[in-house]
Regions:
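A short, Lys/Arg-rich alpha-helix, primarily the initiator
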Residues: 24-49
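General nucleic-acid-binding
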Residues: 1-24
Length: 127
């Protein structure tokens, strides 16, 4: 059974996620910051739910606990390789980290598609 404080923290994190997503599409730069914060909050949420300390998670993926703190606060972006390691450690799919974005159907592209042309395998380049 989870400690009551953990449940409160998870509820607070969920509320923070909702507030962040309400700020989506202000600007591309802001979206990147919001994206980083959402991923960090997802990390904090799963860590609390699973009952791990920041130190335990950091040791598992070979980084410092201070880096975990920065990830959770949205101060640093998580490298792809570390997201993969975290996915394995917590036994979650890779898209867990952006689930709130996917669930809210938020998009990144603001340009219209006719301004780009296909290169290969759905990779597009601006005209």
């Amino acid at each position: 059974m989870h400690k009551p404080r953990t449940n409160t923290n998870v509820l607070e994190i969920n509320q923070s996620l909702i507030e962040l997503m309400a700020e989506w599409r202000i600007s591309e730069k802001d979206d990147q910051l919001i994206f980083t914060k959402i991923v960090g909050l997802q990390l904090k949420k799963i860590r609390l739910i699973k009952g791990f300390t920041q130190t335990r998670v950091a040791k598992a993926i070979n980084i410092t606990f201070q880096q975990i703190q920065k990830y959770e606060r949205g101060q640093n972006e998580i490298k792809s390789i570390n997201l993969k390691k975290l996915s394995e450690f917590f036994n979650v799919s890779f898209d867990y980290w952006i689930k709130p974005i996917l669930d809210a159907n938020l998009t990144f592209l603001t340009r219209r598609r006719e301004n780009v042309y296909p290169l290969k395998n759905d990779i597009f380049m601006e005209r």
